[in-house]
């Protein structure tokens, strides 16, 4: 199975998350996309005091109508920070027959050199990098961390190949300027988030009283 992996705090999940997953699925011919909420994100504190259970519930509601989208709570079962390399290692062990494709945005791709044990990520999974139309990455090899650059070769089109056989695929995505922080701020100011999140998520946030000042 070609399995896409989309991680994040999903605090809350919104329409841009869903569109990213759909465009990655279509571009790479993925069979499924696994949504993986971070239990303890390493790079920034979790805003809004919203538990893993509540964020997980929102993800499950948001993806329920799409049979290609699945939920994983794998990071809730591991102590410590939710490092990508640890999650990929666990998934590689649990699903040895699957072809893993980790989905990230172009901003995250350009910061890979700052990630925990980033060099160990590339043999574990291919990457699908969703680019903004106005910020397409040119010369992708030059944007890779210098310490691993010689492990990659440029192939035809939008593909870069790692020496282990995995790849990095660059996909121009639809521009949807929606962020979870923006949504939290709107809720706190009593402003509408309709058409920025699925209806089920808007209702859930209201029912649970999330993101109130």
From Swiss-Prot:
EC numbers, comma separated: 2.7.7.18
Disulphide connectivity of cysteines: none
Domain of life from the UniProt record: Bacteria
Pfam families, per database record: CTP_transf_like (PF01467)
Pathway in which this enzyme or protein is active: Cofactor biosynthesis; NAD(+) biosynthesis; deamido-NAD(+) from nicotinate D-ribonucleotide: step 1/1
Transferase found in the keyword field: yes
Catalytic reaction(s) noted: nicotinate beta-D-ribonucleotide + ATP + H(+) = deamido-NAD(+) + diphosphate
Keywords: ATP-binding, NAD, Nucleotide-binding, Nucleotidyltransferase, Pyridine nucleotide biosynthesis, Transferase
InterPro entries: Cyt_trans-like, NadD/NMNAT, Rossmann-like_a/b/a_fold
Transmembrane portions of the chain: none
GO biological process, one term: NAD biosynthetic process
Family to which the UniProt record says this protein belongs: Belongs to the NadD family.
Free-text function comment from the UniProt entry: Catalyzes the reversible adenylation of nicotinate mononucleotide (NaMN) to nicotinic acid adenine dinucleotide (NaAD).
Entry protein name: Probable nicotinate-nucleotide adenylyltransferase
Species of provenance: Trichlorobacter lovleyi (strain ATCC BAA-1151 / DSM 17278 / SZ)
Gene of this entry: nadD
